Amino acid sequence: RDEAVAALGFERAYADYRELLADPDVDVVSICSPNFLHHEIALAAIAAGKPFWIEKPMGVSAAQSREIAEAAEAAGLITAVGFNYRHTPAIERARQLIRDGRIGRVTNVRCWLIADYGSSPEGPLTWRHSRDKGGSGVIGDLLSHGADLVQYLAGRIEAVTATSAQFIPERPIPTKAGIGHTGWEVSDELGAVENEDWVAVLAR
């Protein structure tokens, strides 16, 4: 830990998130753990009175996400979900043009989100592919960005029809964990993927 602090230039590091939340010098928290830890850490941050930025999806289920949102609101805390694409200059400019009436009535928005980190069947079976630990697959990981952007630009979605599929049903089981999407070592043994890796949505 001391080596990481020195190498990365941080003032301090913590071995446990509870230690961080107990520090009175910490003003705001970024919750960027794997999905299955979001709920636990967010509720602890709320109990500690710490405002937070939380990665999406907020929880592995709608019930978990709702509980976090309601608890934060009851505590009067400022929070944000990690929909970072809405703050890119192009999106902010498009939103302003729409608000100013410069492009007329918006009748159609098309949004594609493609990520290659899950495209290879040789990629490792990680927590992202587990219903218990990852929750939804591409719906929570990528579609959530699309749904946020569409509503940020054009208003609330009122009706949805959708279909999803799983194109890679099995993946190699890791023998050594990596960080993020890289650095994983895998075995020849395969494990089942539990969530979807493709989804298409038509929304009004």
Task: State each model region's role.
Residues R12, D27-V28, N108:
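Short, Asp-centered acidic motifs that coordinate Mg2+ and/or phosphate
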Residues V28, P34-R86, G101:
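Beta-strand-loop-alpha-helix segment that lines the small-molecule cofactor/substrate pocket
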Residues L21, D27-S30:
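N-terminal Rossmann-like NAD(P) cofactor-binding module of classical short-chain dehydrogenase/reductase
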Residues R1-A6:
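NAD(P)-binding Rossmann-fold cofactor-contacting core
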Residues Y85-A192:
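Predominantly a Rossmann-like dinucleotide-binding segment in NAD(P)-dependent oxidoreductases
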Residues E196, V201-R204:
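Active-site beta-strand termini and strand-to-loop segments that position acidic
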Residues C32-S33, L153, N195:
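Short, well-ordered coil/turn residues at beta-beta hairpins
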Residues F10-Y17:
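Conserved SAM-binding strand-loop segment of SAM-dependent methyltransferases
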